[in-house]
Amino acid sequence: MKISIKDIFQKPELFYQKKILLNGWVRNCRYQKKLIFIDLNDGTFLENLQIVCKEIKNIETADINEFQENQKFNNNNKSSNNINLEKLKEILQIGASLQVEGILKATNNLKTPFEISAQNISLLGTSDFSYPLQPKKHSKVFLRQISHLRVRTKLFGAVFRIRNTAFFALHSFFQKKGFFHINTPIITPNDGEGVGELFQITTLNLEVLPQTKNIPNAFKPVNENTSKKGIDYKKDFFGKKVFLTVTGQLEAEAMALGLNKVYTFGPTFRSEKSNTTRHAAEFWMLEPEMAFCDLSQNLKVAQEMLQFVISKCLEQNYQDIEFLDKTEKNGLIEELQNIAEEKEFLTVKYEQALEILQKSNTKFENPLFYGVDLATEHEKYLTEKHFKKPVFIVDWPKEIKAFYMKNNPDQKTVAAMDLLFPRVGELIGGSQREENLSVLIEKMNQMKISQKDLEWYLDLRRFGGCIHSGFGLGFERLLIFLTGLDNIRDVIAFPRTYHNLVF
């Protein structure tokens, strides 16, 4: 029977003394006079499975070409037991892919309680001494240079198995809560976040376009069909300037005001020229939107979602997280368990958080005054030194938040929330949306946001508008917290960052 290494480690008693077939890659090999030990890994589990190869002399040995073709016989169950140690040594290299047929046997060794006694080994893919992942510790900086191979290491195998679990746990949470999954556009004329850091896309001939220094903010009152350099975008594919999306929120709002509760989960893009450990040009965002939902309910959904995902990862990837606890972030398991069991995340107002920071007697690089957005150093102080746990910051000054956020009765703040996490800083940003049409138009005018491309968005208030709320979760930032790593480049398989696009 063909099984995975994960199957064996989870329930070895089901396979003892049975003939099994498995595939994998050589992580290491050790040679003795009459034995060869192979550490095999197929990517399904953290640990390697030990394969023990003994000389079998009852048949004529095969040459290397026949040895490589042995796969055909294995698949047809026509092969005799065939292991020649000398031939095996000639072709066995770290990184090679193998098919192994043998018997699972128990051992008296606590570190390797079981092993495969090999009867047949087929070489599926060769490797050589230039293979960069030799059995030694490699730095993460080095491994980023070989992103196409780093998933074969113990560290990155663990990271991307956790990523898989977290991804589907998010879907599972919202499906169980009665949300509908929707797909929002990748190509958009709008800057939903108002950040202005957009990737513009065009089918015009770039060889004859004049060079421009900046991409205009799509919300600024400029002519959408021409640029300051005289480029006629009426001749472009869409007849106007368009960009890669920075958020699916606006479209998700439209869908929520018909389906009640929706979420979108996909890639977003930001042309921020930053080389920090927290920023990437392409990243994944999860964005739920809920009709008939106020800010307090919004906070509750965010907390329940995160606790569900953390619990699922602890349940399904405990060995991976345990490995990361030992190698990357001491105390990771305890930290995750504490947050998963937290009754209610702390909630403080922006003014309260600002006062805590100002009274901290800590010298921050970024100044503190009412109306300033909190910097990473401020977020980490609050979560790691003061509260020492996650905290919602609510009721932010309206001047530093987006136009669509609902004004509070004081008319100075908006019903916005940022969820700050230890080690990560801002993990979630969201708000109750402004449902009052006249107030929304007034805010757009104050922020000099053109209504022309957003008449459809205003229609959501004209026709059956209601209170509604939502938030955005930076998926990679969640993964940084789940894995104990400290760089966004290490939780994305093929990261796209400023001046870095190789794979």
UniProtKB/Swiss-Prot annotation:
What keywords are annotated for this sequence in UniProt?
A: Aminoacyl-tRNA synthetase, ATP-binding, Cytoplasm, Ligase, Nucleotide-binding, Protein biosynthesis
The UniProt entry's GO biological process terms, in alphabetical order, are: asparaginyl-tRNA aminoacylation
Carries keyword Signal? no
> Which InterPro entries does the UniProt record give?
Aa-tRNA-synt_II, aa-tRNA-synth_II, aa-tRNA-synth_II/BPL/LPL, Asn-tRNA-ligase, Asp/Asn-tRNA-synth_IIb, NA-bd_OB-fold, NA-bd_OB_tRNA
Source superkingdom: Bacteria
Catalysed reaction(s) here are: tRNA(Asn) + L-asparagine + ATP = L-asparaginyl-tRNA(Asn) + AMP + diphosphate + H(+)
Record bears the keyword ATP-binding:
yes
Question: What's its EC?
Answer: 6.1.1.22
Classification via Gene3D superfamilies: Bira Bifunctional Protein, Domain 2, Nucleic acid-binding proteins
Q: In which compartments does the protein localize?
A: Cytoplasm
GO molecular function annotation: asparagine-tRNA ligase activity; ATP binding; nucleic acid binding
Instruction: Write out the GO cellular component annotations.
Output: cytoplasm
| Family annotation (PANTHER family) | ASPARAGINE--TRNA LIGASE, MITOCHONDRIAL-RELATED (PTHR22594:SF34), ASPARTYL/LYSYL-TRNA SYNTHETASE (PTHR22594)
Task: Note the subunit structure.
Answer: Homodimer.
Similarity annotation: Belongs to the class-II aminoacyl-tRNA synthetase family.
What's the name of the protein?
A: Asparagine--tRNA ligase
